[in-house]
Design a protein with these regions (language model features):
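C-terminal nucleotide
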Residues: 1-10, 33-70, 78-81, 155, ...
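Cytochrome P450 core scaffold surrounding the K-helix E-X-X-R motif
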Residues: 14-15
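Glycine-rich phosphate-binding loop
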Residues: 314
């Protein structure tokens, strides 16, 4: 049995999913692969190839006390809570093409691939990718007390490019993407995802809570950019900055959706919207670091028509959109800057079974 789950990039809507606002995200054709076969023991033997580690877990292990970040055990706990009981041992290999701790969801890919692996073995009927998304979200966020939203799990499980409404219903629709040959470059600056997400989430939610105390029926998704200053007197200046950034990013995401749904989307217009989104992340939420800023400046000077930081920020990767004739120069100059992990990728259909 082989289960493959892709990386993901957020095109529009970073730092929106945990607010219940929509995102546009894309699964890309770089994969984490889980492969395995049964053994004659009660052990799940994990060969973590990229980490050069072997880990063995007894299928009867107590799962009541698990350290946060132990994604394998949390997957087993989540599956068990949904009636998926692993009844025999397996020798399992895990190998990945996905940059680790770089903003393209290596952890979520691991969780989705493992869940899909065990569901294929123990659940005879076909399950929906939305169900896998929900199990992955439960395992990574709810069980572990994480601060993220549902973008990663839904994007990876369902594949392609999706517009995801991250409110109560988690409705999503697939969008035909005009983008080809993404450049993704990892800064190598280690980030602390949950800490960053928690801080920004708390600040923004506090601002929204204070506003809703004055306007109990108000819905964040219904606030227009033109209305933002109406709320300035209700909250302090710092909170207002985060609130304003959330509304701006929401507006950009909806504008991008409108363009993407056209028969012939304008790539230059989409690139400009992406740059606007990046500028909010950089200047209002302040999630970039100096190396990321230098990488972005390099892409801009070398002809990129779109660019942004990917993920929670504080390090990680950038996404670059550029015509083919500019791509090699961008990649070459990034390498000269000391950026060692650079890939070109395209859209992925999502989970693969082999």
């Amino acid at each position: 049995m082989i289960s493959k789950a892709p990386a993901r990039i957020c095109l529009f809507g970073d730092h929106q999913d945990y607010l219940g606002l929509p995102v546009i995200a894309c699964a890309i054709d770089k994969y984490l692969t889980v492969s395995g076969k049964p053994n004659q023991t009660d052990l799940l033997n994990f060969d973590l190839i990229d980490l050069n580690r072997i880990r063995s877990i007894n299928i009867n292990s107590d799962l009541s006390q698990i350290e946060k970040g132990d994604h394998i055990l949390f997957v087993l706990k989540t599956l068990k809570s949904h009636g998926v009981i692993i009844s025999k041992g397996y020798d399992i290999k895990i190998k990945s093409e996905i940059f680790i701790n770089a903003g393209i969801s290596s952890s979520s890919a691991l969780i989705v691939a493992l869940i899909n692996f065990f569901l294929k073995i123990y659940v005879p009927e076909k399950v929906s990718t939305k169900y896998i998304s929900e199990l992955a979200y439960e395992s990574e966020v709810l069980q572990q007390g994480g601060s993220g939203g549902k973008m990663d799990q839904y994007s990876i499980s369902n594949g392609n490019t999706i517009f995801l409404e991250t409110g109560v219903n988690n409705n999503f629709k697939k969008i035909k993407s005009p983008f080809k040959n993404f450049i993704i470059a990892n800064s190598g600056v280690k980030k602390h995802t949950d800490e960053i997400l928690f801080k920004l989430k708390i600040k923004t939610l506090d601002a929204i809570k204070n506003i809703c105390n004055h306007y109990p029926t108000l819905k964040l998704c219904e606030i227009k950019e033109s209305q933002v200053n109406d709320f300035r007197e209700i909250i302090d200046e710092k909170s207002f900055k985060y609130f304003k950034a959330a509304i701006k990013n929401h507006s950009i995401t909806l504008d991008a959706l409108s363009e993407l749904e056209k028969d012939k989307p304008d790539l230059i217009k989409l690139g400009k919207l992406m740059i606007k989104h990046h500028n909010v992340l950089k200047n209002r939420l302040r999630i970039t670091v100096p190396k990321i800023d230098r990488m972005i400046d390099l892409a801009k000077k070398n002809g990129a028509y779109g660019y942004k930081i990917i993920g929670s920020g504080g390090g990680g990767s950038i996404l670059i959109l550029a015509e083919n004739k500019f791509q090699q120069k961008i990649i070459s100059d990034l390498k000269k800057m000391g950026v060692n992990q650079i890939i070109k990728s395209n859209e992925s259909p999502g989970i693969l079974d082999l």
